A protein has these predicted regions:
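AAA+ P-loop NTPase catalytic core and its hallmark functional loops
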Residues: 1-166, 173
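Alpha-helical lid/collar subdomain of P-loop NTPases
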Residues: 138, 147-223
Length: 223
């Protein structure tokens, strides 16, 4: 769990790579249902066949399933994961069979808590996970990231952009502006636009400032 752009998915992908396991990215949304996760019947060659869902395939192959933004889905849809994540380690496929999980199978869920469109996870599901709270990036690590992504960027500007992001973070913490503009991806995109010749002001507007749609808030961000 953690704010946006704190590296939740990167951590999950690197864990899968470190263990040498295939990874399935499963993006959750409000219309997600059990069939989207486990699989569903479909017609193929004039016959009804079972089309495997990503959780089913991950369980069979012993992969790492990354349940991205798990708190976007309805709790009813997530109930199918209960048997997968507890001592049973199995998937019940209605009308077919009970599928045991391969021993290597792991599931990692990511979520931004309290964001628009998200909902509370029920306690039954939450109790099946251990929770890592992802910290916000420090000044030192932010400068390392900028140097790694933009090796041609002058050290002075690396520091300036790092401080810009941290200043926005302070404004968000003090509720002067919303979290919409606190977007590390947006800052990196703005720097890429500058590299392609877009003026700095316009690039920062597109990458950061315009993420807040209120004109008064935009003026606060520009300050």
């Amino acid at each position: 769990a953690g704010g946006k752009a704190t590296g939740k998915n990167v951590l999950a992908e690197n864990l899968a790579a470190a263990f040498g396991r295939p990874a399935w990215d499963i993006s959750f949304h409000v219309n997600m249902d059990a069939a989207s996760l486990i699989g569903m019947d479909t017609f193929e060659g004039g016959q009804v066949t079972f089309r495997q869902g990503p959780v089913y395939r991950c369980a069979q192959c012993g992969g790492f399933g990354v349940l991205d933004e798990i708190n976007m889905a309805k709790n009813e849809a997530l109930a199918v994961l209960h048997a997968v994540l507890d001592f049973r380690r199995a998937i019940d496929v209605p009308g077919y069979a009970r599928i045991p999980l391969a021993e290597e199978t792991r599931f990692i869920a990511t979520m931004n808590y309290g964001y628009a469109g998200t909902r509370e996870l029920n306690e039954a599901l939450t109790s099946r996970f251990v929770v890592i709270q992802m910290p916000t990036i420090t000044e030192e690590n932010l400068e390392k990231l900028l140097r790694a992504q933009f090796s041609d960027l002058n050290a002075k500007y690396v520091h300036q952009f790092a401080m810009l992001f941290l200043d926005l973070q302070k404004k968000c913490d003090s509720a002067e502006i919303s979290t919409k503009a606190l977007d590390l991806r947006g800052m990196l995109d703005a720097l890429r636009l500058m590299r392609r010749g877009v003026p700095a002001g316009a690039a920062l507007d597109m990458g950061i400032t315009n993420k807040a749609f209120d004109s008064y808030e935009q003026s606060l961000i520009r300050d």
